[in-house]
């Protein structure tokens, strides 16, 4: 500590896939959501909870729309309703840098839609977010707050 401020932090963690028992419990909860919820949102932190096998089972069992906030190193989100990466994650998903320009984002977004058979919302920092579907591209701009 220096002048009551943290100067350095070191974390250690072990990341490993979940076991079959926990996977079954998660699927049981998701099955119970059918008829109660039309949308399932999954935020993946790449800590081992969401495995390819679990994701495949979730897609089979859940009858509503699945929305994913992904980690690019996990490449098993095909055929969900919507994937919401930020610009950096979208670049990692495609394996190349995507510039934060409308035409570049539209081209890359359509490529992502085709590759994953899913809609995409790519968040773009101060440039808002862009929704890309098979049929349309829509950019939403962030409203700047006014100070009184």
From Swiss-Prot:
InterPro entries: PfkB_dom (IPR011611), Ribokinase-like (IPR029056). This is Uncharacterized protein MJ1336. It comes from Methanocaldococcus jannaschii (strain ATCC 43067 / DSM 2661 / JAL-1 / JCM 10045 / NBRC 100440) (Methanococcus jannaschii).
